[in-house]
Amino acid sequence: MSPQPQPTQPVRLARAADLQTSGGQTDGMLRQNALTDLCDGICASRMIAKPHSSSAVHHHGAQDTIVLALSGHGTVVSEGGHKRVDLKPGDFCLIPAWAEHQEVNDGDEDVVWGIMRSGRAPEVVNLTGWGGDVAGEGQ
């Protein structure tokens, strides 16, 4: 019988109470890295959207993103602003790599989402609008 592979690092914990603002930000959202720069294939963060706020239009480069709605009722807008996917607590949503989108909180309470991405650390590329240039470039 061949030996079982050994883990490359110990089990890690990121307590919710210890998360601080970090990583890529977009206007209207608070992003807090939870488990980043620990392994090449995945990272995790928390996103908090205050009531009546929305992010800039953005994408996450080559990273696929899975959203788990933890609290509040939020929306992912995509396809040039024409498609809306509403998330309530317990719902999952896949945002494919390079997909332009916007997070929206039209409600009266915070929206909190757990975010898992297919990379070592979250990548956030803010745009000037749907189909727009990378924000801040050439300005």
Feature map (PLM): residue ranges:
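Conserved metal-binding segment of the jelly-roll/cupin
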Residues: 78-80, 87-107, 116-118
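Conserved hydrophobic/aromatic beta-strand scaffold that supports enzyme active sites
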Residues: 44-48, 66, 84, 92-94, ...
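Double-stranded beta-helix
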Residues: 2-4, 102-139
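A short, N-terminal "cap"/entry segment at the start of jelly-roll beta-barrel domains
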Residues: 1-42, 56-57, 128-139
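A short, sequence-level motif marking secondary-structure junctions
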Residues: 17-20, 62, 90-92
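Short strand-connecting beta-turns/loops that link adjacent beta-strands
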Residues: 40, 62, 81, 108-109
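A short beta-strand-loop-beta hairpin characteristic of the jelly-roll/cupin
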Residues: 54, 60-89, 99
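Short, well-structured hydrophobic secondary-structure segments
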Residues: 47-55
